[in-house]
Swiss-Prot record:
Heterodimer of a large and a small subunit. This is Ribonucleoside-diphosphate reductase small chain. The active site is at residue 168. It comes from Spisula solidissima (Atlantic surf-clam). One of its GO terms (molecular function) is metal ion binding. Fe cation 2 binds at residues 161, 224, 258, 261. Provides the precursors necessary for DNA synthesis. Catalyzes the biosynthesis of deoxyribonucleotides from the corresponding ribonucleotides. Transmembrane segments: none annotated. Its EC number is 1.17.4.1. Fe cation 1 binds at residues 130, 161, 164. Belongs to the ribonucleoside diphosphate reductase small chain family. GO terms for biological process: deoxyribonucleotide biosynthetic process. Its cofactor is Fe cation.
Length: 384
């Protein structure tokens, strides 16, 4: 009887223990310690989550940079102003073979030593710089911008920059007969510190992952609008003397192209939602101005061809102010154009197409609005 009662009490006790809730007071110390250690370990080492690439907030809301599944198809046109720029560039196509250099050598031989030095070094800078512009277009802008119309322009700009680089290389190859000097000029980024400084500044923007697309658009507008301006002016200065017709004609074509590229950069900038502050834009432009001024007044002084260095410095600031206005910013220097001969050089030009195909040079019919016009229709009405 006693054993039966004892067994019954043991069963009741074990049943009650099974129903008991474990609290902090009655929890065994060993179990409590294990749970606490587990909680600490899970707090220290959270579960790994998939790491997603960081996208800047500014890029998330930029229509030009937003993912565009229709970027592979041209029509329908969404950005008519950008498309118009592309067609304008397309109409301005030319090739290096169209520039006659046959008369240049006689003039080259008559130049002074310092004039040859200046021209050859300017050409060396130009030959290298177009490749740097293309590096930016291929590696950055063409990958970032998702708007079809803009990608069309960038694609065509790449082709034209290649032609510019070919043209400058042909000029060096034509004028410079010494193989060592020629090699020195072709490798100007490595052999000429003044060219390297300009190249390094441009390359810095290509490799800068912290700067926004808007900042880099401004920087490369400065490359094509400021870094080239003084050198273009110096070659136009030679045109006043009626010498080097091949050099000066190619300079007109290339300066017109670069003017269009700079205008396109400003157009792209106008479409951006998130723009840098005016102070930041002024900073970028001023850096480019100072580098260009040193290049043409100290490292490679334009007085070598008879130009005034102070006026060249002023001209570079004038060009920078003009670019700032295009970017809808205040002027930074408030300078007038000191070179009256540059006032008569329009990037679109006034020369008759059939006389010399210079400024108004464009492929026939490209700007007429496509193949819908009657001027391109095939008829049998003509008199033979």
């Amino acid at each position: 009887m006693l054993s039966i009662n004892t067994t019954r009490k043991e069963n009741e006790l074990s049943g009650n223990l099974g129903k008991m809730k474990i609290t902090e007071e009655n929890k065994p110390k060993k179990v409590l310690g294990e749970i606490t250690n587990f909680q600490r370990s899970t707090q220290k080492t959270p579960l790994k989550q998939e790491i997603k690439p960081v996208v800047k907030k500014s890029q998330q809301v930029e229509p030009l940079l937003a993912d565009n599944p229709r970027r592979f198809v041209v029509l329908p046109i969404q950005y008519h102003d950008i498309w118009k720029m592309y067609k304008k560039a397309e109409a301005s196509f030319w090739t290096a073979e169209e520039v006659d250099l046959s008369k240049d050598m006689a003039h080259w031989e008559s130049l002074k030593k310092e004039e040859k030095h200046f021209i050859s070094h300017v050409l060396a800078f130009f030959a290298a710089s177009d490749g740097i512009v293309n590096e930016n277009l291929v590696e950055r802008f063409s990958k970032e911008v998702q708007v079809t119309e803009a990608r069309c322009f960038y694609g065509f700009q790449i082709a034209m920059e290649n032609i510019h680089s070919e043209m400058y290389s042909l000029l060096i190859d034509t004028y410079i007969k010494d193989p060592q000097e020629r090699d020195f000029l072709f490798n100007a980024i490595e052999t000429m510190p003044c060219v390297k400084e300009k190249a390094d500044w441009a390359m810095r923007w290509i490799n800068d992952d912290s700067s926004s697309y808007a900042e880099r658009v401004v920087a490369f507008a400065a490359v094509e609008g400021i870094f080239f301006s003084g050198s273009f002016a110096s070659i136009f200065w030679l045109k006043k003397r009626g010498i080097m017709p091949g050099l000066t004609f190619s300079n007109e074509l290339i300066s017109r192209d670069e003017g269009l590229h700079c205008d396109f950069a400003c157009l792209m900038f106008s479409h951006l939602v998130n723009k840098p502050s005016q102070e930041r834009i002024h900073q970028i432009i001023d850096e480019a101005v100072k580098i260009e001024q040193v290049f043409l007044t100290e490292a490679l002084p334009c007085r070598l061809i008879g130009m005034n260095c102070d006026l060249m410095r002023q001209y570079i600031e004038f060009v920078a102010d003009r670019l700032l206005l295009e970017l809808k910013c205040d002027k930074l220097y408030n300078k007038e154009n000191p070179f009256d001969f540059m006032e008569h050089i329009s990037l679109e030009g006034k020369t008759n197409f059939f006389e010399k195909r210079v400024g108004e040079y464009q492929k026939m019919g490209v700007m007429s609005g496509g193949n819908t016009g009657d001027s391109h229709a095939f008829t049998l009405d003509a008199d033979f």
